Amino acid sequence: MPINEALFAAMKAASYIKPNAGKSYKLQRVAEELIAKQAPDNPKCRVEDAFAPMADGYAVPLRVFTPLVAYGAPLPEALEESSANGTPVASAISAILPAVLPKVLPKIPIKESTSSGNADGISGNANTELPSVTPRGTILFFHGGGWTTGGINLYTQACAHMAVRLQRRVISVEYRLAPEYRFPTAVEDCYEVARQLFAGELPISGVGGSVDVDHPQRAAPTAPAGGGDISATIPAPDPDSIVLFGDSAGGNLAAAVSLMARDRGEFMPRTQMLLYPVVGNDYNPETSPFESVRTNGTDYILTAQDMADYIDMYRSSVADLTNPYFAPLTAHDLSNQPRTLVLSAEYCPLRDEDEAYARRLQLVNDNVSCYRIHDGIHGYLLNTSAVGLVATTYRIIEHFLDGTPLEPAPGTGTTANAPEGGDAWQDVL
């Protein structure tokens, strides 16, 4: 459907003035940390930090989100209002910050922490007066950012919202970033965290400690001394209740972890959710088999050139391009995969490859769903002004997780730009 003309003009301008990802990822990281510091705490969710040890001595930081209140009738409006009025972490703003950051950096006010928790203003004991609810399961979340940016700080607000909205504990994984750590480091980090979670070996500890924002360049971090142990409150989950979820590069990692798990036989995810995931390897408009790379690859913040840069920064060699753990769509065998939800975005350059991946999964697996989010652009999960898009996404996710049919509801939950009576999504399969 046609996107709002003013919004399109703004995105097109931002897409053209921002530097390519290969030149701006370091400034992007700084911009994201500044944005993360402005994000308000979610009073309906307990947030705690932890670490997962890797075989090479590295400790992967985790952030654990536990809902404190039920998502009841009076809560949606308050929560959506809080999201809409929160710090704007819109993709467009985030994407152009590296271009202007050197000029505005001294002028950006940094919110002083009023929390008694860690250095990021997240308290391990926040809202203890609120009654806890029993989470319905555990979501292991892998963040987006082209494998080079993003992190648990930037995604704190989104993950807290996710935990409350879905009434599930969310564990956000701070895997090591490229280009400092290239393929397969990120996917191996994510795989090992998932393995420990499924095996009941994940040592959720270090609560109240600070997660160093520069940790991707830190050789061997360790959990802070004296950190509390909350393992008693995080029992080994029922494997059937664990969901792998990732957006963008995180969706790539979730899909790759599922393929790895099938091949290695140490555990097997039952459910995965992929939000505008990276599953391909060719973003050259002249050679890509997918039309969305050409139609959506210049004007909607994430460009085809950005994707090519991310691929180059993530891969260790040309051979990686055809490794299914790098580009899941290249896998010759997609059988024995979890029940899968793929969500594509209408104006995303990855749209067609996402839907192609869902179709290939459907050929050899049961219970695969794929929906195209109308008016969606890449990265909208972090856009606090995209309330309609996020609400639509969670509505689809809720039905998928509950196993209930998703019936079209004209006029309900549609995006602001959808025609009156139109639906906010399209069933692709």
Feature annotation, model-predicted:
Residues 22-35, 40-41:
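Catalytic-loop region of hydrolases
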